[in-house]
């Protein structure tokens, strides 16, 4: 949904303006820097049940350091989204930004003025610093959208989207690892199929037909090699 929204906004702004620029940013070490006091104030503004607040307080402050929430905790996803909802409201309602998309700790803003985006960036940085006690990653950039916008593993243009090169390399590395483990008999086929289905599901939303076919061909090769090995074992050839 996030990538679709970026595509929608890119098409909309392209029709509206001759030149479009993108502010792309993400929060530095987000989960590790969520402030417990700020998080609890946000919960207290939305939840009135004292028992629920007590439990949330215990969970959030479980490490005792005052900042950071455990990534694997069931409540962490909710807490992380709720925390940056404060940023969403600030950007949309206080700054009146129309073309804004956030997914977890990554966000983009589209505008036809670089100067306006730099000014918005300064406002966002100040809000994050003083209200949420966060800061942006140094990778923050403002650039023309004709370069394509990297978001959620895709590089997105108004007309199409591609898988990022990093995403493709990661998938290929994982497939090589699975191949070795499967042929060695240390990994079951169901796990590989689940992973492959997830990758293909992600890739199909980009212009990746050839890449997906290559993945399926590679998977078929792995199965054939493993089956031949099993036949040899059964025949006493190994």
Residue ranges and their predicted role:
Residues 1-2:
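Active-site beta-loop-alpha junctions of metal-dependent nucleic acid enzymes
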Residues 5-104, 108-126, 137-143:
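Conserved polymerase palm-domain catalytic core
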Residues 93, 130, 150:
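Short polybasic/polar patches that bind polyanions
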Residues 113, 130, 157-161:
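Short, well-ordered loop/turn and helix-capping segments at boundaries between secondary-structure elements
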Residues 118-119, 136-238:
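Right-hand nucleic-acid polymerase module
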């Amino acid at each position: 949904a996030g990538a679709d929204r970026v595509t929608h906004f890119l098409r909309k702004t392209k029709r509206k303006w001759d030149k479009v620029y993108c502010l792309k940013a993400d929060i530095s070490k987000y989960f590790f820097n969520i402030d417990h006091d700020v998080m609890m104030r946000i919960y207290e503004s939305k939840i009135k049940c004292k028992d629920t607040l007590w439990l949330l307080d215990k969970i959030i402050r479980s490490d005792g350091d005052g900042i950071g929430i455990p990534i694997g905790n069931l409540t962490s996803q909710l807490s992380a989204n709720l925390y940056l909802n404060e940023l969403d409201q600030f950007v949309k309602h206080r700054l009146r930004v129309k073309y804004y998309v956030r997914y977890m700790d990554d966000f983009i803003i589209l505008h036809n003025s670089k100067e306006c985006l730099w000014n918005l960036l300064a406002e966002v940085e100040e809000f994050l610093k003083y209200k949420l006690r966060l800061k942006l990653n140094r990778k923050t950039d403002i650039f023309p959208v004709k370069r394509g916008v990297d978001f959620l593993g895709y590089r997105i243009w108004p007309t199409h989207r591609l898988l990022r090169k990093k995403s493709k390399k990661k998938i290929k590395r994982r497939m090589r690892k699975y191949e070795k483990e499967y042929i060695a008999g240390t990994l079951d086929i169901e796990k590989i199929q689940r992973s492959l289905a997830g990758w293909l599901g992600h890739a199909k939303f980009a212009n990746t037909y050839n890449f997906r076919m290559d993945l399926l061909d590679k998977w078929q090769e792995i199965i054939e090699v493993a089956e031949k090995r099993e036949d040899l074992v059964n025949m006493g050839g190994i």
